[in-house]
Amino acid sequence: MKRRHIVLLPEALADLRWIYDTIEIAAGNVTAIRYIERIEAYCQGLDYASERGTRRDDLRPGLRVVGFERRVTVTFTVESDQVVIFRVFYGGANWEDEL
């Protein structure tokens, strides 16, 4: 297995900002920061043994989907030297329609 560079697209970064804002309103700044840090650490962990999750070629060629803590869905593709994270969906978002 090889390590790959992690790339978060602007849409994924915007998703993380939205998740932060949503949690910050409900639970406060510290809770929101800690949650985002856990999501980011999980995404960075896709650098090794990257070819995991469910393949969803029906939505986009090479697309993979993984869940995080039962509330977050991460969509990404694995390339030869990098993992490209497209979106990070929170809660019950209808992520299939967003891709």
Model-derived regions: residue spans:
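Arg/Lys-rich, positively charged N-terminal/basic patches that mediate binding to nucleic acids
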Residues: 1-34
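GIY-YIG nuclease signature motif recognition
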Residues: 12, 39, 76
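Structural signal for well-ordered, non-membrane alpha-helices
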Residues: 20, 40-47
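Amphipathic, hydrophobic secondary-structure cores in small proteins
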Residues: 22-36, 40, 60-64, 70-71
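Short, hydrophobic secondary-structure boundary micro-motifs
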Residues: 32, 54-56, 97
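Basic/aromatic recognition patch in beta-strand/loop cores that engages polyanionic ligands
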Residues: 49-81
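Enriched for short, Lys/Arg-rich terminal
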Residues: 70-99
